[in-house]
Amino acid sequence: MRRSLLRGALACLLLTPVTAGCVVPPEPGSSGPPEAKVLPADARALVYGRSASEVLENPELRDKVRALFGADWAPPTPGGVGKLTLAAPQYFERGGPLRMVRIADADYIAITGCAAQACASRRGLLLVREGGEQLMARLDEGGFSHHHAYGPGVVGGPGGTAVVLESALRALERASDGSPFPRPAP
């Protein structure tokens, strides 16, 4: 009995550092996430429309937005594995304010929104780089985030789209009262 207790204690002591993890400083020369900040309101935020729905349907962006979301633009089909539970435009049914965000050295129009019937759990963030050639989006679906990228020079993967979108979202949260998304209907 005593021997099994000692083995268990030893196993706990050996596994605790592994399961707790450790913080390792970044390697010299590596960079962290890009710095993002919300810019003062100006007319650039409204160049493609005054609301999320106007931006999604703007003639200059319409085809790019549909290409950005691909198959997720349309309503899901039964048995569609890996698809969203709603069509991408529904994540912007209730749109928040359009804002300008600077990430690193680029300015983006930031459009937030949520699904009318599930505003707390179905949220969207769309970034349109100034000039409209690069688009990135994050659709949050009850704990899962789906990232989309479109345009020349837009990079996916761990150092790309997800990191840029997360930086933008943090900046928008700091500039608002904690959540840049529309509030659920009462």
Question: How would you label these PLM feature ranges?
Answer:
Residues M1-L10:
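Bacterial N-terminal signal peptides that target proteins for export
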Residues C12-T16:
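Alpha-helical transmembrane segments
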Residues V18-G21:
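C-terminal motif of bacterial Sec signal peptides marking the signal peptidase cleavage site
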Residues V23-P25:
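Bacterial signal peptide processing site
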Residues G29-S51:
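Post-signal peptide N-terminal segment of mature Sec-exported envelope proteins
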Residues A71-R138:
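Mature extracytoplasmic domains of secretory-pathway proteins
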